[in-house]
């Protein structure tokens, strides 16, 4: 209609924020409106979807595009109907001891307050009914049960917070008019793409005035399952060592700016790379578990099933408003994460919101749970803070005060990366309170794999490509373990307690 046409007319006129993607020598790129155009538009009951092709040009042409005179970028805009005010929904104050995504508002009329900002958390309104996710027909039938388990696992935490059966998963609609782009649904989508390490993402949309979550989409990439079956990832995933970590905040105080850091560190922009790293870790685990990898074995099928459940649990946590918690693995001892009975009940970490690696047993010991497929104590704690009905801010503070318990501690993205990441316990893809001991076990597994690599490859008349990629998988594990172990030299413990 008219509103959609007016919105579309203005869409390609601005490349705000997109030029930052070029960075460095291409920072002078600007939008060329004469070579930008609309690809598609769609009007839905509560949202409009517009896809445009934006062409940027400037000095320092990119050599990786067909025509160096301009760089085309496809951009998708989603324009939502303004949510109606609901006086029954009470915004909930944020607390830096519990990890939620935030909405921040500046109070202009109170100069006596300690801070001009009011911070509230993103959360669903459960008083109107359950959160309903809709499985799309894109999700292969053989994987739907594993994905559904990962979503419904969160009901255990909501039940303790006073909302039993707070989440529901509907089967794919039979209505041919169903459109997964319609924000009245919260779809579970399945894609396949060329990047063999991307695995999942879960963006959500919240009302900036109240923090009420309006919509979420769970997107899972099926191509990563090929990487898990083979024991290597085609796309080499480098260890996450942001450029800022190599610079000194003393020499350049601007490096401590979260705004600056967000430009070079994707985790501070709300991005999640858990699934990407877990795929690489899963490929390493496949090499360690299967002397002769069989992509279609029963063990591989079980491995993939658990991977999908664990990944979905993590992504649904984001859909519920939760941020990462990278100190959660420190809650359990090395002996506990090696104990199959313990991990079956408590998991391998205190939270599914950590970047939990695969828990490989040392040689000669029984194998515990591979993945975090149960909620940890921090997950129950975080849902209690965000969703349990309370009568006053005192009740909220009382809940947050329990964060001093070891298994309820919280540390997130800005604590784990960059020049201020000084606490070695806050780590990505590490387990237990004895990280050095755990990484030593990983080095031993990698040594064993290197020693037998030539005996395993090539196989079945194939080329040496598989061996080269498997070599890269093992080498990546060496690099990651070495980097995380080195952080213990000169590190310092931090705390959010107050």
Spans of model-derived segments:
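Auxiliary tRNA-acceptor-end handling modules of aminoacyl-tRNA synthetases
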Residues: 1-139, 157, 161, 166, ...
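Generic detector of contiguous secondary-structure segments
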Residues: 262-264, 314, 467-469
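Sec-exported extracytoplasmic/periplasmic mature domains
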Residues: 152-163, 317-318, 322, 358, ...
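Amphipathic alpha-helical segments that form well-ordered structural scaffolds
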Residues: 146, 150-157, 311-315, 477
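Soluble non-cytosolic domains of exported or imported proteins
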Residues: 137, 141-149, 302-307, 311, ...
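Short conserved micro-motifs at the rims of enzyme active sites and ligand-binding pockets
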Residues: 145, 200, 227-231, 362-370
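Conserved catalytic/binding loops enriched for acidic/polar residues
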Residues: 291, 298-303, 328-498
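The catalytic-center signature of Zn2+-dependent metalloproteases
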Residues: 171-193, 197, 306-362
């Amino acid at each position: 209609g008219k509103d959609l046409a007016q919105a579309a007319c203005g869409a390609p006129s601005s490349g705000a924020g997109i030029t930052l993607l070029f960075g460095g020598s291409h920072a002078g790129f600007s939008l060329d409106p004469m070579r930008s155009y609309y690809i598609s538009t769609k009007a839905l009951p509560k949202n409009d979807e517009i896809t445009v092709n934006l062409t940027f040009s400037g000095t320092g042409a990119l050599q990786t595009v067909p025509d160096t005179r301009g760089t085309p970028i496809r951009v998708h805009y989603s324009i939502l109907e303004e949510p109606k005010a609901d006086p029954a929904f009470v915004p909930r104050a944020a607390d830096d001891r519990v990890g939620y995504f935030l909405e921040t508002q500046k109070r202009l009329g109170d100069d006596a307050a300690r801070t001009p900002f009011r911070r509230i958390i993103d959360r669903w309104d459960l008083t109107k009914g359950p959160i309903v996710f809709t499985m799309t027909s894109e999700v292969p039938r053989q994987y739907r049960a594993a994905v559904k388990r990962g979503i419904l696992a969160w009901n255990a935490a909501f039940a303790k917070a006073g909302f039993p059966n707070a989440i529901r998963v509907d089967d794919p609609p039979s209505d041919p008019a169903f459109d997964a782009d319609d924000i009245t649904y919260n779809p579970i989508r399945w894609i396949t793409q060329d990047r063999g390490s991307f695995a999942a993402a879960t963006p959500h949309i919240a009302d900036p005035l109240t923090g009420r979550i309006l919509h979420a989409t769970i997107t899972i990439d099926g191509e990563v399952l090929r990487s898990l079956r083979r024991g290597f990832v085609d796309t080499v995933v480098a260890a996450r060592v942001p450029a800022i970590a190599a610079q000194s905040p003393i020499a350049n105080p601007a490096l401590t700016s979260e705004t600056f850091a967000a430009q070079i560190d994707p985790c501070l922009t709300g991005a999640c790379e858990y699934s990407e790293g877990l795929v690489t870790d899963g490929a390493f685990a496949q090499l360690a578990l299967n002397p002769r990898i069989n992509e279609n074995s029963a063990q591989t099928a079980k491995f993939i099933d658990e991977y999908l459940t664990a990944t979905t649990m993590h992504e649904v946590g984001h859909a519920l408003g939760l941020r990462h918690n990278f100190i959660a693995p420190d809650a359990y001892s090395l002996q506990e994460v090696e104990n199959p009975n313990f991990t079956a009940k408590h998991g391998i970490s205190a939270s599914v919101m950590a970047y939990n690696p695969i828990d490989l047993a040392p040689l000669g010991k029984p194998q515990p749970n591979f993945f975090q497929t149960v909620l940890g104590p921090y997950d129950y704690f975080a849902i209690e803070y965000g969703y349990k009905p309370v009568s006053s801010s005192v009740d909220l503070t009382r809940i947050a005060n329990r964060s001093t318990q070891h298994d309820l501690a919280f540390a997130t993205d800005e604590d784990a990366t960059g020049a201020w990441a000084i606490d070695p316990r806050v780590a990505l893809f590490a387990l237990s309170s004895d990280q050095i001991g755990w990484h030593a076990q990983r080095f031993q597994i990698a040594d064993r794999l290197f020693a037998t690599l030539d005996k395993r490859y090539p196989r079945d008349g194939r080329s040496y490509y598989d061996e080269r990629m498997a070599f890269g998988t093992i080498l990546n594990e060496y690099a990651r373990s070495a980097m995380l172990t080195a952080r213990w030299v000169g590190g310092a413990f931090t705390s959010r307690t107050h």
